[in-house]
Amino acid sequence: MGTPFYCYSTATLARHYQVFAESFPEAKICFAVKANGNLAVLKTLAALGCGADVVSEGEIRLAIAAGISPSNIIFSGVGKTADEMRYALSQQIFQFNVESEAELLALNEV
């Protein structure tokens, strides 16, 4: 077996997510895709109702491929390009964490 090798437990991931979700029943939990973009991990979280916090078009594509609803995707991060904002909007992602007034104006232009 080559390295690196990653072994994930779906049962453990689901259990930890559910304990966290039960601790904060009013919160919408969004996993930071930058923390782990493994499609199997994202699919497991999506099946549990988890949303996604993304910072790039690539992460948007991963979240959608995993089955996370665009209505549960938040586009965060600094330096979003106009093309990335346009792509997010074309995918029906309407939750943006805007990092500056300039970014807000750029989003308004898109």
Mark where each language-model region is.
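A charged N-terminal "starter" segment
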Residues: 1-110
